[in-house]
UniProtKB/Swiss-Prot annotation:
GO terms for molecular function: guanylate cyclase activator activity. Residues 22-100 form a propeptide. Disulfide bonds join 69-82, 104-112, 107-115. This is Guanylin. Pfam families: Guanylin (PF02058). It comes from Notomys alexis. The keyword Transmembrane does not apply. Belongs to the guanylin family. The lineage of its organism: Eukaryota, Metazoa, Chordata, Craniata, Vertebrata. Endogenous activator of intestinal guanylate cyclase. It stimulates this enzyme through the same receptor binding region as the heat-stable enterotoxins. It comes from the Eukaryota. GO terms for cellular component: extracellular region. PANTHER family: GUANYLIN (PTHR11318:SF3), GUANYLIN FAMILY MEMBER (PTHR11318). Residues 1-21 form the signal peptide.
Length: 115
């Protein structure tokens, strides 16, 4: 009987962790890992345009944060970072996680919780 109750509690705990998912935290902001993963797709769409500009006028490049934040496909959960003065830096850190989200899923990054 006790083993059955313990098994059910463990199963419920595992389900709770899976439902909540992995959270990425940067300072006072926290984001679902799934939203962070979407940055990679947005960035890949934007890369060809940025690469062509880099060849001709590397000094004229605009910050990436306003461009990403203005896209309609930008994840809603990440919108609060667009208001931050250091949004560019935050996006760079989140994009590093988005490039290899598996390391976050196993909590290799200190910023990832909920594994």
């Amino acid at each position: 009987m006790n083993a059955c109750v313990l098994s059910v509690l463990c199963l419920l705990g595992a389900v709770a962790v899976l439902v909540e998912g992995v959270t990425v935290q940067d300072g006072d902001l926290s984001f679902p890992l799934e939203s962070v993963k979407q940055l990679k797709d947005l960035r890949e769409v934007q890369e060809p345009r940025l690469a062509s500009h880099k060849k001709f006028a590397p000094r004229l490049l605009k910050p990436v944060a306003p461009q990403l934040c203005s896209q309609s496909a930008f994840p809603e959960a990440l919108r609060p970072l667009c208001e931050k003065p250091n949004a560019e830096e935050i996006l760079q850190r989140l994009e590093a996680i988005a490039q290899d989200p598996n390391t976050c899923e196993i909590c290799a990054y200190a910023a990832c919780t909920g594994c």
